[in-house]
Amino acid sequence: MMKKMRGIGRSGRCGRPGAGARRGNDAVARAGKRPAPGDRLYNFSAGPATLPLDVLEEVQGDLVNYKGSGMSVLEMSHRGKDYMEIAAKAESDLRELVGIPDNYKVLFLQGGASSMMASNCHNLARATDSADYVLTGAWSVKAQKEGAKLLKNANVCATSKEQNFTTIPDVKDWNLTEGSKFVHICSNETIGGVEFKEVPDVGDRVLVADMSSNYLSKPIEVEKYGVIYGGVQKNIGPAGMGICIVRDDLIGNARADTPSMFDYKIMADNDSMYNTPPCFTWYISGLVFAKLLKDGGLAAVEQRNIEKANVLYNAIDNSDGYYVSPVDKRYRSMMNVPFTLAGGADLEKEFLAEAKAEGFEALKGHRSVGGARASIYNAMPKEGVEALASFMKDFKARNA
């Protein structure tokens, strides 16, 4: 079973990790055959997404009998000693990894970012209040629509809709509302592939950021935010949990009609265990935090991500227009790289089919924009991005 899990590759070039890739052998040649059943693929899914192989193997080794406890984490009571230690270590490691100040709470919540789009409104504003939203793509649009249900005014203070969400409006042009309770951004748009490169200066207003798709991809200046939130299923762990980092002074002001599960004070007072939490996702996320610490922290993570993104963007930019990135170069995402083929829809279809046959999984662009998209989160090895770039070059040579 372990052998299959590792996905030992056959000889020759293939678009998936094999024994050579894990040893640093970056020799690549086009395979042209579908990977054998049981081999691991290069998974470019936008989420749920690829997880670190060593973390998966640790989970596999402990799955039936966790650290000699006689049971699986899947079976443990969240109130039991073993699980309480797992949960406490996960929070401690996350605080160390990110450098979270003592005046911020860390909440491990069910529902993901979509739920927190609503719970932020319940905790930070009354129904008669206003909040400002910067629209840079599908997820910030979704957050604003949720805010419009719960606030008197969910003001669109800036939008790049006219540019098809391929850029980010300059902060000096944002039309912020007097007295607004918070300013909401999505730090990285998974679908459109645009990413904030600096924390926007909104003065003394409360900045709220959905970081679902670039959580832990680089250092975070936590003190510049009031709330940082996001689902973990893209860059941290399996689906089923969101992590919310909230400044203390923003806790305890929830509306009277706020559901208990949305009330940040209730969740903080109960150490995120007001009800049974998403235990297994929390556990695996904790393993990822520990791994990132061991691997050098977020500065090292960022450097690896820059190198990976450069490989892919260089493949696009040096293709003489064969591959096209629609995104403003100033705001290109390190995590999600959408691109099209200048040859049109039929050629894109052929590209995606060949890529899948060679072990490059989930490259199809989001249904709302089409084209292709490679999500290259923390756990995607550089060898995977290099293999994709090589395949792209080869495909062009055969089809130009």
Model-derived features: positions:
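A glycine-/small-polar-enriched, mobile loop at the entrance of the PLP active site in fold-type I
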Residues: R40-E91
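PLP-dependent enzyme catalytic core of the Aspartate aminotransferase-like
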Residues: L41, H366-A400
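Active-site phosphate-binding strand-loop segment of PLP-dependent enzymes
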Residues: G47, G147, T159-Y215
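Conserved N-terminal alpha-helix of the aminotransferase class I/II PLP-enzyme fold
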Residues: S69-M116, N123, A138, E146
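PLP-dependent aminotransferase-like
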Residues: S114-V183
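Conserved active-site segment immediately N-terminal to the catalytic lysine
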Residues: V208, E221-Q233
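Active-site C-terminal subdomain of aminotransferase-like
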Residues: V232-N314, D328, R398-A400
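Conserved PLP-binding catalytic core of the aspartate aminotransferase-like
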Residues: Y323-A355
